[in-house]
């Protein structure tokens, strides 16, 4: 069904998607758009975006810096039926809204790469939270951090997207998984209070840490508030979400893939779930994308979800600019 697949960008993400696509669609013809001249066996290589248009792909996967999205999308032909964009969608809400207009075509599936929604352990945690298995949520704590030079030890961190403002780096965009899955679990963000900046000696021109308070909308009229801390400098790699509930506490460990509980009346944590690692999320994400195209259905992570992340980041930036005052998340300008 899909005879031509194009991958734009060939960093770690591009390599992963090419392998996934070749495994799932072995009979397809593949094109990789990259400045690299070699090292991609059995695949056509293009160095110019104009060659993408001439290739006429059925599916296009956009990896690389978020700042390059619009230039690539302008070259995608109308007959393309599936577009996958690595997260984040864009570098700002204004740019994201403009991009969404270009992408929003009938009979085309567009999915954004928030793969942690496909984590077995996070799905279990979300189910328990939403089913109130430990009672109503009283508070949320989220903590994510890793020493930036250790992300990709085979390359100089100073040249990475994460380290450069012009490419869409910094914790707000690079760790935007948190803004996506926290809303997926707890609901839309109503308001934020935020500070972010550079606290370490890392040789980067972006924020390396952010401390954000988020208020989530609730149908029951009870506001759920989360404290979120992100950074690029901690050596003990961490990704956790803790839900403090009326009848105990639930904790998700995204590094280990575990869910643990501390029920009321007990004195220790109990193991609830031991999920598979993050690698399985990429394959599940790709399968869901292909299935959405084949069935002409909505993808698991829609263009609107990518925009919602940018709305939260926009509010965070505005709050920081105004000395951490409370800022409502602006949902005007919806185009989807």
Give a label for each model feature.
Residues 1-42, 55:
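N-terminal Rossmann-like dinucleotide-binding module
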Residues 30, 59-62, 131, 217, ...:
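C-terminal helix-rich "cap/oligomerization" subdomain common to oxidoreductases
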Residues 115, 240-308, 325-328, 335-336:
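C-terminal glycine/acidic-rich active-site capping loop/insertion
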Residues 59, 65, 70-117:
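Beta-strand-loop-alpha-helix segment that lines the small-molecule cofactor/substrate pocket
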Residues 119-203, 323:
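Predominantly a Rossmann-like dinucleotide-binding segment in NAD(P)-dependent oxidoreductases
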Residues 173-174, 179-258, 287-295, 334-336:
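Contiguous beta-strand/loop segments that form the cofactor/metal-binding neighborhood of enzyme cores
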Residues 26-28, 79-81, 106-108, 221-224:
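A short helix->loop->beta-strand "cap" motif at the edges of active sites that frequently abuts
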Residues 41-52, 81:
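Active-site regions of enzymes building and remodeling cell-envelope glycoconjugates
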């Amino acid at each position: 069904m899909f005879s031509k697949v194009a991958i734009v960008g060939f960093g770690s993400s591009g390599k992963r998607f090419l392998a996934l696509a070749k495994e799932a669609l072995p009979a397809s013809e593949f094109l990789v758009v990259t400045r690299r001249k070699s090292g991609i066996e059995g695949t056509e290589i293009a160095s110019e975006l104009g060659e993408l248009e001439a290739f006429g792909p059925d599916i296009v996967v956009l990896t690389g810096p978020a700042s390059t999205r619009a230039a690539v999308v302008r070259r995608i032909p109308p007959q393309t039926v599936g577009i996958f964009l690595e997260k984040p969608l864009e570098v700002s809400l204004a740019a994201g809204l403009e991009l969404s207009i270009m992408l929003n075509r009938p009979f085309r599936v567009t999915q954004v790469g928030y793969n942690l929604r496909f984590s077995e352990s996070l799905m279990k945690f979300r189910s328990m939270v939403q089913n109130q298995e430990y009672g109503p949520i009283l508070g949320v704590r989220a903590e994510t951090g890793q020493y930036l030079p250790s992300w990709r030890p085979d390359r100089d961190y100073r040249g990475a997207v994460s380290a450069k403002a012009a490419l869409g780096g910094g914790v707000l965009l690079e760790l935007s998984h948190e803004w996506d899955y926290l809303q997926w679990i707890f609901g839309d963000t109503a308001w934020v209070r935020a500070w972010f900046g550079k606290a370490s000696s890392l040789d980067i021109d972006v924020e390396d840490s952010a401390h954000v308070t988020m208020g989530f909308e609730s149908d029951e009229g009870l506001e759920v508030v989360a404290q979120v801390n992100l950074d690029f400098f901690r050596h003990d790699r961490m990704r956790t979400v803790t839900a403090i509930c009326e009848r105990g506490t639930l904790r998700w460990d995204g590094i280990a893939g575990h869910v643990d509980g501390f029920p009321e009346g007990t004195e220790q944590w109990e193991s609830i779930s031991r999920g598979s690692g993050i690698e399985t999320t990429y394959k599940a994400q790709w399968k869901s994308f292909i299935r959405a195209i084949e069935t002409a259905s909505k993808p698991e992570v829609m263009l609107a979800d990518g925009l919602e992340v940018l709305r939260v980041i926009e509010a965070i930036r505005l709050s920081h600019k105004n000395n951490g005052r409370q800022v409502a998340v602006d949902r005007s300008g919806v185009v989807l």
